[in-house]
């Protein structure tokens, strides 16, 4: 399996279990030399698995390497020496966990391993701090940091507000911070709130799953950028000039209206965060959403963007680049090879239409067959379905009442 990611948008599509998350895990490892969700373990011998990877880096030139799996130690060895610097890397997992790699904080020389390889957050650690069960924190967590930033009224909260505005589901449903407040007798922390479109301030911990995921992404992006700037200043180095987002099921928990906006928002989020226009964003996202693909039609450029299909062919998983063309709407994407649906309808409606189309091709259909298929259509299609015009004309041409 070989994939040559494009420089901006990369969608991974395919049925469940064919390897989208596998590719995201492997991409994270190639960029950071760490595993976000545990080591990928290959098949049993006699196979001799290896991962070959290459990418451009901040300094001139391209980095390339090959790692061969060592079965005795169950590791994928890396080349010795300084690891390359791909830029900031953020990996959003579908269960609400996140991983962050920062070249200013996780970039080590020789065998100096006092610094963490990366920051791996379980879902509860995003909110409660990392590590959650120790008093000394690498990250205070969303609840504490948000309240502190808001009280401080400094650049971090200004950045958070801009990022939330950029990632909001629509102009009519902005993600506006409310007033932090205590929400439980057993927890004296002041919890962040959001002002809902209906005017009520709702604690973030009680918000919907979709809002919590996007707010978590916004928080970690600001936390990463703030800590990166401070660390880069201490090291006497310029800040990173690139960010890579790896996102598993980018549409998870999001209403279709939000699905339609999320990818353009992520591409523009660094401008909202930094106020600068020249920080490139690369997105590698797994998706099952035709709305997500339809949302980028006006931006898609085959020189910088790609859709990668994973298909099962003859018992093997095959990866290929989808030949890009505008489909026009989400239904057309559903019936493309990316999703492989014959019809964007219920199974019963699809079967009824299949039978009807077969009958339309028949030279001498029987009255009984026409009546039987007509009953199936009436049971499955809506009264205003566009297929009724064709079916009604077919029945009239044969002088049959149906």
Sequence positions of predicted segments:
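Switch/communication elements of ASCE P-loop NTPase nucleotide-binding domains
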Residues: 1-36, 192-337
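Acidic, Mg2+-coordinating catalytic modules of nucleic-acid enzymes
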Residues: 4-9, 298-302, 311-402
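Conserved P-loop NTP-binding catalytic core
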Residues: 6, 13, 24-78, 83
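Short alpha-helical "patches" and their helix-cap loops
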Residues: 42-47, 230-241, 348-355
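A general structural signal for short secondary-structure junctions and capping/turn motifs
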Residues: 43-45, 78-87, 207, 275-277, ...
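Short polybasic amphipathic segments
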Residues: 46-67, 190-198, 305-311, 355-358
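Coupling/switch segment of ABC-type P-loop NTPase heads
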Residues: 71-171, 331-338, 342-344, 348-357
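Extended helical coiled-coil dimerization/tether regions that scaffold
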Residues: 118-244
